């Protein structure tokens, strides 16, 4: 574009020209024919520039002059006031100042009126431009938008010559620009009025932009010509872009604000500098009479500035004018510094922008859950493996993970593999904004994972409790399932007003369940493995070889499920339904949800014949997958009575009561598949029998109302608090004490160790469904300083002793007769602050290997076996019932530590490889596939991870598991413990004694007794039916010798667990049968009833035959006196301990 165009057909009458142009030597410029311009084509750029300079410097001069006069006036006035005060002091205060000064009162009134008027106007202007009000925000945003509009007009006009003749009434862009600048002028006035410091306001960037852009527009209208000039300065308004976005509440985070700030400063500087180069290069140098100009578009200048800032400098575009080159020299210094600092920081902010920001978009017809807390590769993979297991049918639930740390590459890859059902968002549940992002208000549940390996369990629990508080505060109705490490921290959850276990909120206490599982293994070895496998989803692994792994893995494939019973079972007793379901449907039902006359739900585990199946009864089944359990719901006596193949039992065409009442069954029926849980009214509150089932008359008659033997709930044995000094045994005292059939608990802990929570280990062993003489003595071996810290929770339990020492000392172990114990428990030291994971269990592994390598003199066991105190519970040596017929004949004692029953707690699963030296387990083998775990001699807290998903799909499963392993702990009892941190004793009443009438887990020997005929090649299904019909015992598994399948005899005494064997499974004489046995009211008077015997009877191959005896009514009256005399001797001995 050229500034030299020939002018033709112009009006030469100077009087008709709109402007009287002074005569001066100037370059003739071309103009359009349509616009009446100066006939001589004189440049008028100086007029536009002068308008801005005069405005700027004139205003600056006025402000400085006003400040100077104000300063002089203030100084003079101040001097006059001083003289006046001096005169008042000298003249007594009656004289007046000179006549030039007004009276004081009148002057003060005028100043106050003046200040009040100015202040009100100033405040009004401040409100108008303030972003704190709606009007101010609208005005600020409008000014910014119009500034960008003016900049766009500049971009459009930059394609025209720098100076051209344009008619204001015909040029549309000039009219729009004029309107914009009128608005800018008004806004400038408001800003000027509201400014506290007028001088700084006059010098700030936005004011300078207005000075050099607004006045030239009015000059353009007057001269009928346009000059691009300094209109590019409007680009500096982009610096305020971040402020505008903050006013609109779009930018909220510091990183986003910083990013927008850097980008806006960089772009505005870039565009402004490009505008200056465009101006000088297209105009030329004034001292060269504008002859050295070059034609550059604005965007070519933008390109030139970019290659200059980046130090590339291709040379294809460069500055020719002196002004342009001089500007480039200084711009390179500043531009290069800005480019080198701003661009990397911008890239870093963009690169660090949260990849997992955004918000969750709910899918119609699909529920979602939020998982938070301890999110790592291990915890997430374990959770997903169980939650998305194929045996759960189609899980139509999306999993949303929320964590404040972005996932590493391995975890990110895991999320990508499950991208159809898993999403990850970076954030914190403590932030309500992040909770809104994951749509917590519409989530079906929120699951909180805990770090099981943290160094400070109390701190981890506190973090999870705060997460619960935050989530419940945001949405009180959300269902929360959280993991807790310490039992005593569960009490804090009860303080949250919206926490309601009846609505589905659950706290899975890992210490409570872990120690409960171990405690049950003291009563029925191997039970911890069986229960852990039942609530964990495992795929079936088929092995053709006839090895112990084949039978173990067949049982591992079983899980716990719930399903509603068909109306065909209504009216039948629980044992009758159990037998029918097992024999015909190939299912094992162990419990039901029972509604009392008050419509209160309770879960009954193996109730007796008195419980009849109601309509809509929920059954708890052990099966290999959810499809098999549906047979219990589809079963129809008319259609399926003659079917022998259970796979053919499917929904029939009969009109069923369930179909007539869909509102009763349908809402709950699908809880397995989609997580639909029971309604609040159906949440079971207790796992005990009907309250009407009170003890028999004999038990009530023998009840001593003045003695507190049980806690206030009647669920546990209780005794008055004992001082710890009274239960401490020295090594010599322990050696002199007759200890047999007891439980030795080895503890590695010191005064600084985190508390294990030994109460959770002792409570199941002190459940009230055991008679007092059946309770196993518990001996703790460990640091006295640590045990003192735990004693406050243990001092109300009977038959507890402490031997200060170390489990690594063989002398301490011999002192407690470890070779005669029923179980040796080795608990982890909780040393989770060790970097090497393999060393976390070093004490437990060393203690286990130390015990297994010990040798014992058989004569000691024989001598002690001849003493009365060695008599195992459930056997009377003076009774004729003590015969091989009942399987309680005492065998020679253990001579090697390898035969001592041990269960070892491990922190790190991989350390299980060090426990058994004769196994061939690979270090990468999963825990449940290893020999120590299959045999029930090792337990790790990691197996409890599966309870999170199991509880979500069915909260009754957690209630069932908790009752089985804790001995009967209920929410009411937890509230009581939270109040006092100790069990409270209570008097025996028919109501509390009724709570003793509940099932317990035991083991049944097949070597002799009523089932001896089935032990040698018999059928497991026949044993199941016989035990159920005769003794109301519900069998659910086998504890078999590891080498029982071999044709040649083996000296190995290790056993493994077989869960829910099929009906035709062949039995061997050495098998021990897991069973749920009823509470025997008469066992308190006669110890020849079916009771749990000392498990030292199976700890060696010679003693594997006797665990339980079968009730015998013969000679019962004759044995009562003998038992009473022996009980007196034992009570005296217990007091001494």
Curated annotation (Swiss-Prot):
Cited Pfam families = BK_channel_a, Ion_trans, Slo-like_RCK, Slowpoke_C
Keywords, alphabetical: Calcium, Cell membrane, Ion channel, Ion transport, Magnesium, Membrane, Metal-binding, Potassium, Potassium channel, Potassium transport, Transmembrane, Transmembrane helix, Transport, Voltage-gated channel
Chain ranges for the short sequence motif Selectivity for potassium as given in the UniProt record: 311-314
Region (Segment S9) location: 738-758
Q: Where in the cell is it found?
A: Cell membrane
Write down the membrane topology: Multi-pass membrane protein
Those parts of the protein on the Cytoplasmic side are: 66-137, 195-198, 245-259, 348-1137
* Residue numbers spanned by region Segment S7: 515-535
How this chain assembles, per its entry, is: Homotetramer; which constitutes the calcium-activated potassium channel.
Purpose = Potassium channel activated by both membrane depolarization or increase in cytosolic Ca(2+) that mediates export of K(+). It is also activated by the concentration of cytosolic Mg(2+). Its activation dampens the excitatory events that elevate the cytosolic Ca(2+) concentration and/or depolarize the cell membrane. It therefore contributes to repolarization of the membrane potential.
Name of the protein described by the UniProt record: Calcium-activated potassium channel subunit alpha-1
Q: What is the lineage of its organism?
A: Eukaryota, Metazoa, Chordata, Craniata, Vertebrata
Coding gene?
Answer: KCNMA1
């Amino acid at each position: 574009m050229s500034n030299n165009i020939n002018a033709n057909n112009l009006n030469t009458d100077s009087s008709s020209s709109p402007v009287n142009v002074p005569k001066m030597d100037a370059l003739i410029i071309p103009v359009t024919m349509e616009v009446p311009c100066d006939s001589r084509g004189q440049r008028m750029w100086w007029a536009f520039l002068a308008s801005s300079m005069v405005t700027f410097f004139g205003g600056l001069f006025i402000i400085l002059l006003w400040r100077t006069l104000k300063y002089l006036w203030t100084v003079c006035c101040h001097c006059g006031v001083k003289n006046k005060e001096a005169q008042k002091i000298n003249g007594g205060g009656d004289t007046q100042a000179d006549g030039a000064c007004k009276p004081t009162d009148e002057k003060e009134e005028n100043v106050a009126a003046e200040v009040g008027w100015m202040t009100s106007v100033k405040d009004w202007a401040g409100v108008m431009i303030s972003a704190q009000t709606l009007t101010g925000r609208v005005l600020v945003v409008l000014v910014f938008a119009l500034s960008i509009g003016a900049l766009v007009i500049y971009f459009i006009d930059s394609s025209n010559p720098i100076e051209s003749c344009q008619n204001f009434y015909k040029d549309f862009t000039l009219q729009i620009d004029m309107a914009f600048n009128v608005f800018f002028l008004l806004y400038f006035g408001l800003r000027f009025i509201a400014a506290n410091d007028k001088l700084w306001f006059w010098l700030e960037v936005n004011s300078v932009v207005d000075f050099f852009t607004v006045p030239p527009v009015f000059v353009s209208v007057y001269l009928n010509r346009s000059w691009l000039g300094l209109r590019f300065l409007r680009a500096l308004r982009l610096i305020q872009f971040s402020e505008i976005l903050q006013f609109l509440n779009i930018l909220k985070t510091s990183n986003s604000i910083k990013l927008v700030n850097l980008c806006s400063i960089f772009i505005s500087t870039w565009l402004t500098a490009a505008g200056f180069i465009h101006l000088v290069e297209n105009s030329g140098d004034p001292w060269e009479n504008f002859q050295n100009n070059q034609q550059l578009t604005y965007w070519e200048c933008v390109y030139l500035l970019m290659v200059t800032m980046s130090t590339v400098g291709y040379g294809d575009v460069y500055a020719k004018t002196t002004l342009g080159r001089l500007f480039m020299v200084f711009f390179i210094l500043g531009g290069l510094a800005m480019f080198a600092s701003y661009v990397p920081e911008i890239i870093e902010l963009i690169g660090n922008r949260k990849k997992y920001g955004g918000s969750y978009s709910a899918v119609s017809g699909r529920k979602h859950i939020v998982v938070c807390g301890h999110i790592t590769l291990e915890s997430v993979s374990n959770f997903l493996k169980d939650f998305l297991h194929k045996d759960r049918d189609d899980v139509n639930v999306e999993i949303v993970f929320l964590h404040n740390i972005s996932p590493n590459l391995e975890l990110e890859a895991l999320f990508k593999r499950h991208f159809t059902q898993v999403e990850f968002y970076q954030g914190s549940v403590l932030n309500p904004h992040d909770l809104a992002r994951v749509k917590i208000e519409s989530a079906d549940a929120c699951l909180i994972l805990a770090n099981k390996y943290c160094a400070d369990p109390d701190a981890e629990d506190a973090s999870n409790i705060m997460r619960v508080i935050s989530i419940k505060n945001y949405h009180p109705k959300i269902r929360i399932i959280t993991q807790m490490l310490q039992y005593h921290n569960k009490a804090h959850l009860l303080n949250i007003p919206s926490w309601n276990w009846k609505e589905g909120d659950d706290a899975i206490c890992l210490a409570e369940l872990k120690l409960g599982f171990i405690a049950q293994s003291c009563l029925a070895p191997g039970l911890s493995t069986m229960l852990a496998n039942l609530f964990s989803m495992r795929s079936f692994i088929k092995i053709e070889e006839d090895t112990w792994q084949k039978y173990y893995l067949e049982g591992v494939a079983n899980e716990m499920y719930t399903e509603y019973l068909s109306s065909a079972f209504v009216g039948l007793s629980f044992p009758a339904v159990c037998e029918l379901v097992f024999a015909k449907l190939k299912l094992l039902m162990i419990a039901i949800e029972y509604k009392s006359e008050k419509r209160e739900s309770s879960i009954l585990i193996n109730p007796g014949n008195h419980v009849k199946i109601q309509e809509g009864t929920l059954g708890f089944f052990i099966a290999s997958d959810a499809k098999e359990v549906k047979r219990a719901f589809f079963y129809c006596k008319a259609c399926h009575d003659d079917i022998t193949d259970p796979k053919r039992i499917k929904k029939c065409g009969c009109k069923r009561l369930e179909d007539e009442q869909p509102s009763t069954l349908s809402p709950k029926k699908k809880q397995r598949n989609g997580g639909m849980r029971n309604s609040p009214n159906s949440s079971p509150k207790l796992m005990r029998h009907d309250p009407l089932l009170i003890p028999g008359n004999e038990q009530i008659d023998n009840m001593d109302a003045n003695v507190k033997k049980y806690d206030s709930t009647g669920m546990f044995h209780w005794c008055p608090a004992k001082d710890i000094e009274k239960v401490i045994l020295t090594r010599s005292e322990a050696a002199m004490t007759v200890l047999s059939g007891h439980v030795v608990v080895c503890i590695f802990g010191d005064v600084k160790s985190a508390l294990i929570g030994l109460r959770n280990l002792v409570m199941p062993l002190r459940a009230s469904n055991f008679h007092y003489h059946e309770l196993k003595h518990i001996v703790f071996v460990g640091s006295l300083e640590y045990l003192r810290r735990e004693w406050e929770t243990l001092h109300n339990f009977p038959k507890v002793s402490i031997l200060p020492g170390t489990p690594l000392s063989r002398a301490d172990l011999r002192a407690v007769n470890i070779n005669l114990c029923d179980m040796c428990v080795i608990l982890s030291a909780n040393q989770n602050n060790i970097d090497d994971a393999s060393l976390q269990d070093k004490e437990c592994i060393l203690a286990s290997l130390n015990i297994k390598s010990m040798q014992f003199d058989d004569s000691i066991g024989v001598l002690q076996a001849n003493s009365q105190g060695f008599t195992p519970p459930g056997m009377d040596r003076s009774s004729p019932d003590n015969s091989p017929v009942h399987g309680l004949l005492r065998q020679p004692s253990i001579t090697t530590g390898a035969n001592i029953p041990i269960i070892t707690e491990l922190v790190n699963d991989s350390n299980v490889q060090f426990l058994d030296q004769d196994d061939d387990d690979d270090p990468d083998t999963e825990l449940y596939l290893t020999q120590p775990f299959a045999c029930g001699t090792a337990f790790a807290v990691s197996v409890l991870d599966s309870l999170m998903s199991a509880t979500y799909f069915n909260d009754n499963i957690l209630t069932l598991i908790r009752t089985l392993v804790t001995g009967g702990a209920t929410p009411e009892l937890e509230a009581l413990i939270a109040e006092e941190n100790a069990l409270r004793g209570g008097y025996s009443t028919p109501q509390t004694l009724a709570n003793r009438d509940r099932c317990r887990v035991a083991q049944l020997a097949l070597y002799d007794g009523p089932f001896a005929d089935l032990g040698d090649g018999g059928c497991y299904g026949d044993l199941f039916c016989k035990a159920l019909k005769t003794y109301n015992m519900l069998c659910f598994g086998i504890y078999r010798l590891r080498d029982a399948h071999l044709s040649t005899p083996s000296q190995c005494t290790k056993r493994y667990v077989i869960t829910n064997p099929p009906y035709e499974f062949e039995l061997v004489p050495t098998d021990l049968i897991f069973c749920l046995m009823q509470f025997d009211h008469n066992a308190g008077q006669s110890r020849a009833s079916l009771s749990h015997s000392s498990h030292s009877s199976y700890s060696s191959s010679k003693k594997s035959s006797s665990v339980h005896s079968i009730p015998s009514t013969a000679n019962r009256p004759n044995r009562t006196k003998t038992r009473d005399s022996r009980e007196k001797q034992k009570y005296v001995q217990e007091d001494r301990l």
